[in-house]
């Protein structure tokens, strides 16, 4: 099962829910606070399989355009309304005219971007006058470090090319460097708790499936044992519980 198949699987989507790993309630609250209404056109950078775009048009009656970063996910995007569309593109090379969106939404995608300032500068060009940037991201606590096995997995594999963990202050600085004024910023413990609850729900099933499956991490060029994978899963849960990992949101407008 590749990433597209997993994301499009009804059982996976039912278990994880819309806007995973974020919270749909928090996403809707942030969008409401940003002034999204039936006249808005939202650009969602990193749209996954489109559940958030669908959520927005159903709740606010707006238009939504989702940029999908992983091309195989396009076939699983949720098309249920003519007000929503999706396309595959990089976050820093968007095929749109400038200044045509009222809002740009980024959730849990900054962590995958090595040049975050470039992402925010691109987002700025997409916004019409008076437009708003909404960012909702996982963060690592200042002066904290990754758990032992999880840190090894990221440091010793290609994960270090795609995971760029930042503190809330570091993301805020990148937003400001792109010449945005930060209108509001706050921690989002509801997202962290929801993610922890989801992981607890699937923990036993995942552990049983991994233990009894024929999957061999080494055969996938991933130099860790099943036991270490399970330990990393538990480390991640503990890091959420003790707030080593958290969630933070920003609302910003171009200067």
Could you describe each region identified by the protein language model?
Residues 12-28:
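Conserved SAM-binding loop and adjacent beta-strand
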Residues 163-179:
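Short alpha-helix
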Residues 49-93:
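Class I SAM-dependent methyltransferase SAM/SAH-binding core
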Residues 103-116:
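A short SAM/SAH-binding and catalytic strip from SAM-dependent methyltransferases
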Residues 117-132:
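A short glycine-rich, Lys/Arg-flanked "PGG" loop and its adjoining helix->strand segment in the class I
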Residues 184-255:
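Conserved Class I S-adenosyl-L-methionine
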Residues 92-104:
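A short acidic, Gly/Pro-enriched loop at the edge of an enzyme's catalytic core
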Residues 134-156:
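Conserved class I S-adenosyl-L-methionine
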